[in-house]
Structures are given as structure tokens and as C-alpha cells.
Design a protein with these regions (language model features):
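Short Gly/Pro-enriched turn/cap motifs at secondary-structure boundaries
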Residues: 51-54, 130-131, 182, 274-278
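Short, small-residue-biased leader/transition segments that mark boundaries at the very start
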Residues: 1-8
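Non-catalytic interaction/Regulatory regions outside core domains
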Residues: 15-25, 38, 45-55, 81-89
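Active-site SXXK
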Residues: 67-68, 81-104, 227, 295
């Protein structure tokens, strides 16, 4: 039995220790980019005119390590609409302002199993909007942003929070904001239905406008990678070294992302990629590997669930090639 114990000990030690060099990560990231770049699957979001006209060949991939080093390949300086990835940022903001339990009580953390803009989900679970990472919960989250009743100061808080997470300021894409405002009929219905169930905590039209504006922020893949890195680094921005939020909130937001980051495809994503990730119809995806790295990718063509085809493929390639994932049980060390 002693021999078996030694074998078990060696196996546990092997499973828990994994060293990966920065050069390996760079090499695999470049492989992923080259592998995916020529893909022609998916199509731009066509229900928002601005997004429909973005160059579908744009593609960028960015990785932020815990030492602050970033790896950037392709169109990582192109500003695209952050769209639903902004839901993660505002979820973090209300977690900072209210604490984890209050957010759970007022919004929730459950996946709906339905499309991100579902009205039916509200009717089925009218006691709470389910999660800040679908449209109903995100609009509710915007209504919670302090100070309640002051749109300008709420907006300042939203932008400041994004700036701290990314290490640099986003820019509002005015054309996208106007395009979204002119076509957000479904979200207007959601906002007022939430009001009917007392699940919105400020003026519904104000909350909807804030949500529409935050989705219209222009951000780069590099900025998004740093934001993912900040979550992975337990709330400390790896580049600026600023403590953006308490470490205790990091697993809360990561659990939300893993549960519903890819909406009704979230289970398939976690099964095949093994890394919590959040998508947006602007083509961006941010992924968080706690304690190791933040990864982001951007490419406009989407699958039927509204997730970037190239971004998914690239991130999945990196995780699988490096043998990384939140469920692997490895203690990963990045070496020079």
C-alpha cells in the first residue's frame, strides 16, 4: 500500500503543478490567430445598422498576464462596440456598491436558458431578473447604480468603473448609440415589464438609456484583455496595479460569467473551452482564467446565439493547446 500511496502522491503533485513559459503562450496565441483568421463562418449582427457595416475581416487577440505583460496579435487597437460584455463591468460596479448578497437578492445569479433578450424569462421568473448578464438583469443593474436618480453621475460611475478595469478610458461611439436607441424596442418592453414587477430601482427610461449607452462604449481587444486580467487577478489591475474591487468579489463575478457568459450556449462553451467567458454582439469576447490570465478576442461575425465565431475558436484553441481550464485542478505558474 505504501507503493500505491507514493504513486498517488506523485499523481496529485503532477496534477497540481503546471509551468508554462511566456514564449509558449505567445507561440500558441500566434498559432490560434493563424488557424482562425481565414474562417468565414458567422455573420455580423444585422439588427443594429452600425454593427452590420463593420468590416467582417477584423480580428484581434489579446492576452493579459498577472505580471502586467500583454500579448497582442492582429487588430487589438481597433475600437469596437463593447455591447453585452459591458454587463460584466456594470455587474462589478453594483457588486462594489452594494455587496454580493444584496446583488443576489435584488437581481439574482441564475441562468435563464433562454436568449439574452428574452421577455419570457421575466414572466417565468418575475420575482427577480435572474442575472446581471442578460438584458433584463443588466437594465436592472443600471437602475441600481448609485447615485439613484442622477443619470449624469450614474454614467460617470459606469465609465469610471470601465476605465479602472481596463486601465484606460473607453470612448462612446455616438453613431452606435444612436443606432441602438432607434432599434431598442424589445429592451424598452423589458424595462417597463421589470417596473411592473418592482424589479427596477430607478426610472425605467433612465435605466434603459444608461444600458444602451454602456453597450455603445468603444473598447479595444487589448483593453478588454486587461479587464479580464483584472478579474483573474482578484480585482487588481495587472497593468496599473490599482485595486479596482475586493478580492472576495472575483469568484462571484467569475461564477456569473461561467453560468451565462455565452447565454444558452454557456454549458457547451464551458465543456469545450473550460474557461469562463462573456460575449457581445459587437464581436468581442473576454475570458477569465483565475490567477493565470485574461484573454480577449474580437471579430464581428457571430453564430446564431450572438457569439463571435473567430473569438470563440481562438480562445478555445489556446486553452486546449496549453491544457488550461478552470476545472483542470492545476496550479499554473507562468515562467519567463
Amino acid at each position: 500500500s505504501r507503493g500505491l500511496g507514493d504513486v498517488y502522491k506523485r499523481q496529485v503533485t503532477t496534477n497540481m503543478e503546471k509551468k508554462i513559459s511566456i514564449s509558449q503562450i505567445k507561440e500558441v496565441a500566434q498559432e490560434a490567430y493563424n488557424e482562425v483568421k481565414g474562417s468565414t463562418g458567422g455573420k455580423n449582427a444585422d439588427y443594429i445598422p452600425y454593427l452590420a457595416n463593420i468590416d467582417s475581416k477584423l480580428f484581434g487577440l489579446s492576452i493579459c498576464l498577472m505580471n502586467g505583460q500583454t500579448i497582442n496579435i492582429g487588430d487589438t487597437d481597433y475600437r469596437f462596440g463593447i455591447e453585452s460584455v459591458s454587463k460584466v463591468h456594470t455587474a462589478i460596479l453594483i457588486l462594489r456598491q452594494y455587496g454580493a448578497q444584496k446583488v443576489l437578492d435584488m437581481i439574482g445569479a441564475d441562468a435563464t436558458g433562454l436568449p439574452f433578450n428574452s421577455i419570457i424569462a421575466i414572466l417565468l421568473e418575475n420575482d427577480h431578473p435572474s442575472t446581471p448578464l442578460v438584458n433584463a438583469g443588466a437594465i436592472s443593474a443600471c437602475s441600481m447604480v448609485q447615485p439613484v436618480g442622477n443619470s449624469d453621475k450614474k454614467w460617470d460611475a459606469i465609465v469610471q468603473n470601465v476605465t479602472e478595469l481596463c486601465g484606460s478610458a473607453p470612448q462612446l461611439i455616438d453613431e452606435l448609440y444612436k443606432s441602438e436607441t432607434a432599434t431598442n424596442f424589445n429592451n424598452r418592453s423589458i424595462a417597463w415589464l421589470l417596473k411592473n414587477y418592482n424589479r427596477i430601482y430607478d426610472n425605467p427610461d433612465m435605466a434603459l438609456d444608461l444600458y444602451t449607452r454602456q453597450c455603445s462604449l468603444g473598447i479595444t481587444a487589448q483593453q478588454l484583455g486587461i479587464a479580464a486580467g483584472t478579474i483573474a487577478n482578484n480585482g487588481v489591475n495587472p497593468v496599473t496595479k490599482q485595486t479596482v474591487f475586493e478580492a472576495s468579489l472575483a469568484p462571484k463575478i467569475t461564477s456569473m460569467i461561467s453560468t451565462v457568459g455565452f447565454y444558452e450556449h454557456s454549458g457547451d462553451w464551458m465543456y469545450t473551452a473550460g474557461i469562463p467567458a462573456k460575449s457581445g454582439v459587437g464581436g468581442g469576447v473576454m475570458a477569465v482564467l483565475p490567477g493565470v490570465m485574461g484573454v480577449s478576442a474580437f471579430a464581428p461575425p457571430l453564430d446564431e446565439a450572438g457569439n463571435s465565431v473567430k473569438a470563440q475558436s481562438a480562445i478555445k484553441f489556446i486553452m486546449n493547446k496549453l491544457g488550461l481550464g478552470v476545472f483542470n485542478g492545476d496550479n499554473v505558474t507562468i515562467t519567463e
